Regions:
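Non-catalytic, surface beta->alpha helical segment in thiol-disulfide oxidoreductase systems
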Residues: 67-94
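Short, structured active-site "lid" loops
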Residues: 55-73
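Thioredoxin-like thiol-disulfide oxidoreductase module
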Residues: 39-61, 90-94
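Short, glycine/charged-enriched secondary-structure capping and boundary segments
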Residues: 19-20, 55, 80
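Local sequence-structure signature of Cys/Sec-based thiol-disulfide redox active-site neighborhoods
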Residues: 1-37
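Residues at the C-termini of beta-strands that transition into short coil/loop
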Residues: 9, 42-44, 80
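Surface-exposed, flexible loop/turn segments at secondary-structure boundaries
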Residues: 11, 46, 73
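Glycine-rich loops and low-complexity Gly/Arg-rich segments
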Residues: 27-32, 62-67, 90-92
Length: 94
């Protein structure tokens, strides 16, 4: 399983509020190490990796998680609690 976290950077260069909140939750629970890669959707750069992948998966909010399992379509999670319950908890990671 491969997990990608996409976070949004605002025009002033700061992380969006929800992105900060999710980052803090991941850090507090020791889950940040379970994220394989983090991409930044920088509103100042329409070609940033995060914006490009958001377009690819038709996601319009951040943060979001992309969960890739071998032989399956990628799953997109835009709600942290659902991601934690469906991905982290079954994997014995909570």
């Amino acid at each position: 399983m491969k997990i990608t976290l996409v976070k949004k950077v605002l025009a002033d260069g700061s992380l969006c509020g929800k992105c900060r909140d999710v980052q803090e939750r991941l850090e507090a629970k020791g889950h940040l190490s379970l994220i394989d890669r983090t991409l930044i959707a920088d509103v100042r750069d329409p070609q940033s990796a995060g914006i490009t992948i958001a377009r690819q998966y038709k996601v319009e909010r951040a943060p979001f998680f992309i969960v890739e399992r071998e032989g399956q379509e990628a799953e997109i999670y835009t709600i942290y609690a659902k991601f934690a319950k469906e991905v982290l908890q079954p994997a014995g990671r909570l």
